[in-house]
Amino acid sequence: MNASTETSIALPDINDIMRNLPHRYPMLLIDRVVAFSKRERLVGIKNVTINEPYFAGHFPQKPVMPGVLILESMAQACGMLAFKSEQEELGGNHIIYLVAIDKARFKRPVEPGDQLRLEASLKRVMRGLWMFQAQAWVGDALAAEAEIRCTVKEA
């Protein structure tokens, strides 16, 4: 699906992402949103460059994005899906907390120059717990996938 078939509202830009997520450099791991369907799915982009601070030590001779940061980027896409889906109800005084990651699998390394396509799909919301299926893709290759659970709380 392309962005125009998924939503009739303007897609979040980096300023909107920064209004909704509390993360800042070097932990803001989503650069833009390219598709959004309220309470269904969000597709975000993370451009991976050699200038990322973690590449200095992971690993100097063969830089690879740490798996935990791939998971964090997927969790941020899930957070954006939750916030954009409920922005009228939540207002601006809430923060999303990661509760659990299950069934995390890493399929290929993510290297400098790669563009991560972060796909977050909402499975259900139950008693304040948001449950997502998330994937990170590089081109047509699945890099990682996980089930992610979050909760939204007042800041």
Swiss-Prot record:
Please write the reaction equations for the catalytic activity of this protein. Answer: a (3R)-hydroxyacyl-[ACP] = a (2E)-enoyl-[ACP] + H2O
> What does the UniProt entry say about where the protein is found?
Cytoplasm
Please give the biological process terms from Gene Ontology that the record holds: fatty acid biosynthetic process; lipid A biosynthetic process
Q: Which residues form the active site?
A: H58
What EC numbers are recorded for this enzyme? 4.2.1.59
Chief subcellular location? cytoplasm
Q: Which GO cellular component terms are attached? A: cytoplasm; membrane
Highest taxon of the lineage: Bacteria
Q: Which residues form a coiled coil?
A: none
A Pfam family per the record: FabA
**UniProt keyword terms in alphabetical order:** Cytoplasm, Lipid A biosynthesis, Lipid biosynthesis, Lipid metabolism, Lyase
Q: Name one GO molecular function term.
A: (3R)-hydroxyacyl-[acyl-carrier-protein] dehydratase activity
Does Nucleotide-binding show up as a keyword for this record? no
What's this protein's family per the entry?
Belongs to the thioester dehydratase family. FabZ subfamily.
Query: What is this protein for, i.e. what is its function?
Result: Involved in unsaturated fatty acids biosynthesis. Catalyzes the dehydration of short chain beta-hydroxyacyl-ACPs and long chain saturated and unsaturated beta-hydroxyacyl-ACPs.
Q: What is this protein called?
A: 3-hydroxyacyl-[acyl-carrier-protein] dehydratase FabZ
The scientific name of the source species is Alkalilimnicola ehrlichii (strain ATCC BAA-1101 / DSM 17681 / MLHE-1)
Lineage start: Bacteria, Pseudomonadati, Pseudomonadota, Gammaproteobacteria, Chromatiales
